């Protein structure tokens, strides 16, 4: 017996049914999910604010990390907390006390610039999310992206997809380094000829 927590906004996952007394608990933006969020507001690089609904209960939470994807993470956490019997106050406190680990959406602020450090074990989804967040920053927005590893036979296509996404984002400069990132840089430039794209084959360059 138990539960499995799934993203109810995923067309494939939403089809999962109870199996061997394992009950699916869905989270997402649809009010048909057991745990859902709405009234989502971006606070720029400071984070996100949203209302989380747990059954007949709703509460507002300030997520201290930016990006719409962090709302999904908060909803998943709320679903797990609810399963384990935490109160809404405890769930809210846990989400609002979140601290990023090194390499995972960590903000490094200096007197001249702000670095969004999301370099640990990057993947296409995390890179696209980082680019989306970068758009909310003030001043010049510079993305420095490297090769993504362990992507298998689709590695070239996946780097191109990130490049296309970068080309559509409101950023000022894209710097790509690494052999696979050549595909990313070329696709970004084709997608947005006005974007300043710099490519270096290795970090030493």
Where is each model-derived feature located?
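Conserved residues at the C-terminal ends of beta-strands
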Residues: 177
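Short acidic-hydrophobic, aromatic-tinged amphipathic segments that line or gate anion-handling sites
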Residues: 196-205
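Glycine-rich phosphate/diphosphate-binding loops that line cofactor/substrate pockets in enzymes
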Residues: 133-142
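Charged helix-capping and loop-helix junction motifs
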Residues: 128-131, 155-166
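Acidic, Mg2+-coordinating active-site environments of NTP-dependent enzymes
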Residues: 1-115, 139, 164-167, 171-173, ...
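Glycine-rich phosphate/pyrophosphate-binding beta-alpha loops
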Residues: 101-103, 120-129
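Short, glycine/acidic-enriched loop or turn micro-motifs at the edges of active sites
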Residues: 10, 120-122, 150
């Amino acid at each position: 017996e138990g539960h499995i927590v799934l993203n109810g906004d995923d067309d494939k996952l939403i089809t999962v049914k109870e199996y061997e007394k394992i009950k699916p608990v869905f989270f997402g933006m649809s009010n048909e999910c057991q745990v859902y969020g709405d009234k989502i507001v971006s606070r720029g690089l400071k984070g996100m604010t949203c209302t989380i609904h747990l059954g007949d209960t709703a509460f507002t939470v300030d997520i201290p990390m930016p990006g719409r994807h962090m709302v999904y993470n908060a909803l998943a956490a709320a679903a797990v907390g609810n399963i384990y019997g935490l109160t809404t106050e405890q769930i809210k406190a846990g989400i609002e006390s979140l601290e990023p680990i090194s390499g995972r959406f960590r903000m490094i602020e200096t007197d001249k610039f702000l670095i969004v450090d999301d370099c640990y074990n990057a993947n296409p989804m995390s890179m696209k999310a980082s680019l989306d967040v970068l758009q909310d920053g003030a001043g010049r927005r510079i993305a420095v992206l490297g090769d993504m590893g362990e992507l298998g036979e689709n590695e070239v296509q996946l780097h191109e997809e990130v490049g296309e996404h970068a080309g559509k984002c409101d950023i000022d400069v894209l710097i790509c380094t690494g052999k696979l990132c050549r595909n990313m840089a070329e696709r970004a430039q084709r997608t947005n000829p006005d974007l300043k794209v710099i490519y270096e084959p290795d970090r030493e360059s």
